[in-house]
Amino acid sequence: MLDLTYEAPKPKVIAGAKHDWELVIGMEIHAQVSSNAKLFSGASTTFGAEPNSNVSFVDCAMPGMLPVINEFCVAQAVRTGLGLKAQINLFSAFDRKNYFYPDLPQGYQISQLYHPIVGEGEVLVEMAPGIARLVRIERIHLEQDAGKSIHDMDPNLSFVDFNRTGVALMEIVSRPDIRGPEEAAAYVAKLRQILRYLGTCDGNMQNGNLRADVNVSVCRPGQYEKYQETQDFSHLGTRCEIKNMNSMRFIQQAIDYEARRQIAILEDGGKVVQETRLYDPDKGETRSMRSKEEAHDYRYFPDPDLLPLEIEQGWVDEIAASMPELPDAKKARFMADYGVTDYDANVLTAELEAAAYFEEVARGRDGKQAANWVINELFGRLNKQGLTIADTPVKAGQLGGVLDLIASGEISGKMAKDLFEILWTEGGDPAEVAAARGMKQVTDTGAIETAVDEIIAANPAQVEKAKANPKLAGWFVGQVIKATGGKANPAAVNQIVAEKLGL
């Protein structure tokens, strides 16, 4: 396991006009369950389908249609809970959250208020190498997503697309343990990474498959410690919720603006109103959406169409037995097995596909060299062209072949980069391409000695300088490699130059 030092949350202190203030942040992450069917119907969850084409009679609340729980969605929620080291509740139940909105055909949302499927868990957020913060998870519950209202197609009409209606969501609720914008973004990034490793949510924020509601409040220094002692939320100040954030950068910007807005109100002698707000990235500010409702405003009651959900411990154990290696464990293994640095291990394990690619390249080879090539050459080229690891034209086997040619001494590092470029644009087998292009390193010491002798004979003044300052011998090495068209083995050239110059 990773050798981590746990650090108490460090609040971001914001200087107001009159006082210092501290930030307190809690988050509700809405993660769309990776499932081919919706939570209570068999309708497809395919993104980007024609409007209102993925809608069943259950989704659009036709009379007499009853919901039927999707067992796979339940398993995905359990898997998520296990991945977050959370308590799995063998008994849970669904409730109706009553409110009217055009994209909610039933007039209520099926959720889990009183008996969620997953209880308390945790997420470790590494803020610096070896330094981790613990963010506690309060609960995870299953619920339906709503549809999508569209207001910009006609100046006089609004439209509703019910394709998303009834899609399964996991709402992952944190404790108010987050103390700054950067930590909030890091928490979302770590949670997204875990969900993607688990295969329970694809984490695509652009498509709305992972959305964050951010609860922000400010308090005077020392008040948070009183909350920790008493668990009395009144010490934390009045919170405002910023809805539907789908960007790490916007999350940070919204928190920073909202904190300063609340501080200005309090220092002017006003009171912060508990409300739901939206973030406008164009203006860089939050704006009021509606007053913040409490649970009683929604008139929650148990859904009479759904029996309580009772699962067996044996089924939970089966899911636990099939759990994949998670990011922290994979990072620790990469550092131990392949000798990569903490930074490189973070980069290599950021995405599951990238970690698999690296491991295929590194297996049986120099791990540090493999990491250097994957991060600097491959990832650098992918980022430059805006591609993902799935789009790479150089497969892991091909890059491994390049490293094998370097290890055998057949090609130099410079040749390897030229070969990588050819594989990127044209493809092919590395060994065959190198042979066809004459990319073979000169290792014949006789040929190298001849080249060294010629360079030394032609540059007597440079010879005297090199003897006086051995660091200048590198000039001869460069000239020899240049004279051989870049094919001379650098190690052999260095050795022969040193011998010839008597260094």
UniProtKB/Swiss-Prot annotation:
It catalyses: L-glutamyl-tRNA(Gln) + L-glutamine + ATP + H2O = L-glutaminyl-tRNA(Gln) + L-glutamate + ADP + phosphate + H(+); L-aspartyl-tRNA(Asn) + L-glutamine + ATP + H2O = L-asparaginyl-tRNA(Asn) + L-glutamate + ADP + phosphate + 2 H(+). Keywords: ATP-binding, Ligase, Nucleotide-binding, Protein biosynthesis. One of its GO terms (molecular function) is glutaminyl-tRNA synthase (glutamine-hydrolyzing) activity. GO terms for biological process: glutaminyl-tRNAGln biosynthesis via transamidation; translation. Its EC number is 6.3.5.-. Allows the formation of correctly charged Asn-tRNA(Asn) or Gln-tRNA(Gln) through the transamidation of misacylated Asp-tRNA(Asn) or Glu-tRNA(Gln) in organisms which lack either or both of asparaginyl-tRNA or glutaminyl-tRNA synthetases. The reaction takes place in the presence of glutamine and ATP through an activated phospho-Asp-tRNA(Asn) or phospho-Glu-tRNA(Gln). This is Aspartyl/glutamyl-tRNA(Asn/Gln) amidotransferase subunit B. Disulfide bonds: none annotated. Belongs to the GatB/GatE family. GatB subfamily. HAMAP family: GatB (MF_00121). Heterotrimer of A, B and C subunits. It is an enzyme of class 6 (ligase).
